[in-house]
Regions:
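Bacterial N-terminal signal peptides that target proteins for export
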Residues: 1-7
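Ser/Thr-rich, Proline-interspersed low-complexity disordered segments
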Residues: 10-13, 17-50, 561, 565-566
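Flexible loop/hinge segments at secondary-structure junctions
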Residues: 47-254
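Acidic, metal/ion-coordinating pockets
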Residues: 247-566
Length: 566
């Protein structure tokens, strides 16, 4: 019974299913077989090559710092993804920057040996300096002249480091004093005459006297610098490729770059007349300059103060021609021979044969390509300063005739009065100097002053010359000085009250009038560094001859004794 009921139920369910819609077909199943990836090795980064640069820490601190700054900028700019450059403290580097003779020059640093200006000796031997440094201070007793005292060397830390690189470690000595840079000069002056200093060439100034070392004078353009023993040559050495890149990127630095130097030779009285002219006729027109020509032609600017006009009808010279003067135009050959560049016209004999002689004289100078100042075709021309730029140094010359006679007028040629309304009033010169100084010029001012036949200056002379320096002149020159006179030296500039005759030699009544000085002023990077004094005696009524060492020392002692040092 139970079985029959179950079968009936199952049959009913089947019949009910037959009445529904067609069934949804079952979708086909697609089977995709994926390949198993083959594992790839992780790439190893290629190391970037590194080149190292080492800067010697023993270099003077100022130079070391300058190099580090320049090289830091270089490594940043020159590094690439393919090569890095780094500065290192390890001397075991690809490139070493240090003192040496090999490699690419980066810095040439010249040291100067100097003493206070009123020092009589002109130089020393390098061997003496080496012995002094090694602990023998008596090796340089000659620097104190007749005192015979072992001197003290004053220098700052950078100069000490530089000398240590050149000479080795110094001996412990009270005669070697390392002081602050600003104290070197005042301490040397306080301890003169037994004191000297070593400092960078470009830090010289007028209160120092540059000393020669083994006869090498750094104030000479032609100085054999390769023979000078106190020059640091800092070079890059090592990997040639990197060294070449450094040399191309970092222009070499030189603190005695001749392209930045200007030498101006200032001279005393020229008057090609009387005994001097007689000797020129007898022995040749260039005879007076033959012994000192090199002092003049090696300057960048050679100054001549010619007090006399040329005239083609000038009477033949004689020893008794007196004080009315003219010169044969042929004598201009002497001025050519010494390399004249600038002619001063403050002299008081330009009109001796009439003002008409001056214009043709000026035309002669212009044909030679020479420039003039302190006089001119008229008042405006005479008062006009002469300006020029020499190797980047801005120079200005200004001069006036304080003493008198042949002053230029509005329509007459002549020498420049010191002021248009009053030839002895210096206010016009002072204002002009101030203006030129404000414009960046190194002003050289000259005065045709009252003539004195003694070494000392007068109170009025000291006052008037100092007024021009106080206005801004770095050099003040007494062009009137038939007799050589002393100096006034201060931080503001150099005054020479009288340089003496040069090509005017028959004033035989006075030894001082037979003495001449050529003041070779040195400018560097538009700054006045100081003066190189040349000394001579005029012989044979006409010819300056360089003094021997004893004669020169005697003259310097005389002049220093009557000079002012501030």
């Amino acid at each position: 019974m139970f079985v029959r009921r179950w079968l009936s139920l199952l049959l009913g369910m089947l019949l009910a299913g037959c009445g529904s819609a067609e069934p949804t077909p079952t979708p086909a199943i697609t089977i995709i077989f994926l390949a198993t990836p083959t594992p790839q090795p992780t790439p190893t980064p290629t190391p970037v090559p590194v080149k190292t640069i080492w800067v010697d820490p023993a270099l003077p601190a100022g130079l070391h710092q300058a190099l580090m700054q320049r090289l830091s900028a270089f490594v940043e700019q020159a590094s690439t993804p393919a090569r890095r450059l780094v500065l290192t403290e390890s001397p075991d580097a690809d490139v070493r920057v240090t003192v040496g003779r090999a490699g690419a020059p980066l810095i040439t640093h010249t040291l100067a040996v100097a003493a206070p200006f009123p020092t009589v000796p002109d130089g020393l031997a390098f061997e003496q300096l080496r012995r002094f440094w090694a602990g023998q201070p008596d090796a340089l007793t000659s620097l104190s002249d007749q005192a015979g005292i072992a001197p003290t060397l004053f220098l700052d830390g950078d100069a000490h480091a530089a000398l240590t690189l050149l000479l080795g470690q110094p001996a412990a000595s009270p005669n070697i004093q390392v002081v602050a840079p600003q104290d070197v000069l005042p301490l040397a002056w306080q301890n003169r005459p037994a004191a000297f200093a070593v400092l960078p060439f470009d830090r010289l100034e007028v209160r120092w006297k540059l000393l020669h070392v083994d006869g090498v004078n750094l104030f000479e353009r032609e100085a054999p610098i390769d023979a000078y023993p106190l020059t640091l040559s800092i070079r890059a050495q090592g990997d040639p490729e990197v060294v070449d890149e450094i040399a191309a990127a970092l222009p070499a630095m030189d603190n005695r770059d001749l392209s930045k130097m200007a030498i101006v030779a200032m001279t005393g009285v020229t008057a090609l007349v009387r005994g001097t002219a007689v000797r020129m006729e007898q022995k040749g027109i260039t005879y007076p300059a033959e012994k000192i020509r090199d002092w003049l032609v090696t300057a960048d600017v050679t100054h001549i103060s010619n007090e006399v006009s040329f005239w083609d009808k000038c009477p033949p010279p004689s020893f008794s021609s007196g004080v009315v003067m003219c010169s044969d135009p042929r004598y201009i050959e002497l001025l050519r021979y010494v390399g004249t560049d600038v002619v001063e016209l403050t002299g008081n004999h330009l009109w001796d044969y009439g003002y008409q002689r001056l214009i043709p004289t000026l035309e002669m100078y212009e044909r030679e390509g020479w420039r003039y100042f302190g006089g001119g075709r008229d008042l405006a021309d005479a008062l006009r300063p002469l300006t020029m730029t020499v190797n980047g140094n801005r120079l200005a010359f200004i001069g006036c005739n304080w003493f008198g006679a042949n002053w230029a007028k509005e329509n007459l040629p002549g020498s420049a009065p010191c002021s248009p309304g009053d030839p002895r009033d210096l206010s016009y010169q002072v204002e002009t100097i101030r203006r030129l100084r404000a414009e960046g010029y190194n002003v050289i001012a000259t005065l045709q002053y009252e003539e004195y036949y003694f070494y000392e200056s007068t109170l009025r002379q000291r006052r008037d010359f100092a007024a021009l320096r106080e206005a801004g002149a770095v050099v003040v020159n007494g062009s009137q000085g038939h007799h050589v006179q002393g100096f006034d030296i201060s931080a503001e500039g150099f005054i020479h009250w009288g340089t003496g005759n040069i090509f005017f030699g028959d004033q035989t009544f006075s030894k001082g009038a037979q003495t001449t000085m050529v003041d070779r002023h040195v400018f560097y990077d538009n700054r006045y560094l100081g003066v190189d004094l040349r000394t001579a005696f005029i012989q044979d009524l006409s010819q300056p001859v360089p003094m021997n060492p004893d004669e020169r020392a005697a003259l310097l002692r005389t002049l220093f004794n009557v000079s002012l040092f501030r």
